Every structure is written in C-alpha cells, then in structure tokens.
Amino acid sequence: AFSILGYYGFEVYREAPPIPQQYVSESGEKVITHDDILHGQTAWQTTGGMQVGSVWGHGAYQAPDWTADWLHRELTNWLDITANQEFGKNFADLNDEQQTLLKARLTKEYRGSKVENGTVVLSNTRLAAMEKTAQYYISLYGDDPATKVTREHFAMKDNTLPNLQARKDLAKFFFWTAWTASAERPNTHASYTNNWPHEPLINNVPTPENVIWSIASVVFLIAGIGFVV
C-alpha cells in the first residue's frame, strides 16, 4: 500500500505543471518571473486561499474558480483587442467568418504556448489582454468602488489584499494557473490540467480519458454502494 502511495505521489510531482523561470515579451523584455508567481501564490494564501474561490477546481465555491475566471476573461480580452485592431469593432459585433478566423488564431496561440529553456514568449496582444485582466483582479482584491458589488457577491471584504504589489503578484499567480489550463503538455493534445476547465473558445473540452474515468468512477461508486447494501 505504501509503495502504491509512493508511486502515485511521485507521478503527481513529476506530472505537475511547470513554473517557467520567466515569461517575456516578443522583444525579450521580462514580464513575469518564477519568483513573481510564488510571491503571488503566497499572497493568495494570505487571503484564505481556497476558502475564497478555488484554483484548478479545488476550493470553496462562494467565489469563482480563479483559474477558469482568469482564462475566460483573458481570452475574451484578446478577442476584443484583436477584433478592434483588425476590424474596428468588438468581437461580438463581427460576422461568423471573422469570428471563426480569430478563434482559430486564439486557439493556436494559447494551446501552442510552450516553455523553451525555462522561458515562455508572449505576444504583444496577449500581454495587453493579460494587463486588462490583471486590472480587474487588482481592483477586486482592493477597495475600488467599481468592484464593490462584486466583492459583496463573493463574500469578500474591501481591501482583501491591501498591498498593491501583493495584488499585482496575485494576478501573476492567477495568470500562471490559467496558462497551465490552456497550454498543451508536450507531445499531447491536452493542457497541463487535462483540458480543465471547459473553455470552448480554445477547444478545452473533455479528453477521451476524462470521459472514461468519469464513467468508471460512477460505475465503481454504484458497485461500492451495492456491495455495502
């Protein structure tokens, strides 16, 4: 039993999503470092961590899953930024052909994001989408009146995280969790989180393995209940 636990413990460690040494712009400018992400994780933990929302689906549900929330916000920001740059209007106002074109580019960029020599290169458009997304979280975890009602809905107090730098690092941590949920694990067609959360904008849909294990789990549960009864 201990051997099995040890084996799976090692596998979890080995298969854990990587924390890159740095994220850089196309010109090579350093944007996020490994330490920034760890500082952001610590900042998040000081607010109660998984007692306020969840990350990767683990935590309390009175607030959103921050991974899923960040990912969707960043994707929609990317689409709006690109749509305005190329067509002069928001993504929702484009015709079907234009939307399909942009979604294909979005999917290629996000799912194709990879670590090379400890570094991930981000496009200028993605950086702009990240910055817009980060501002929402910096506002939410502070005392900005613009997000006060949202804080009330999430049972968050004003200045949940009073230090501005801590809020900026928190945003970088949330970004990293979303990056792991969208970037494909090398030599696979699934993200580091096995295509969780569901996000059709970039084809984050359940893998065959997910479906099989979900069915198997239900079967084993019913069988176990039947055995006990």
Question: What are these language model-derived features?
Answer:
Residues 15-211:
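Soluble extramembrane regions of membrane proteins in the secretory/endomembrane system
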Residues 1-10, 44, 52, 210-229:
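Hydrophobic cores of alpha-helical transmembrane segments in multi-pass integral membrane proteins
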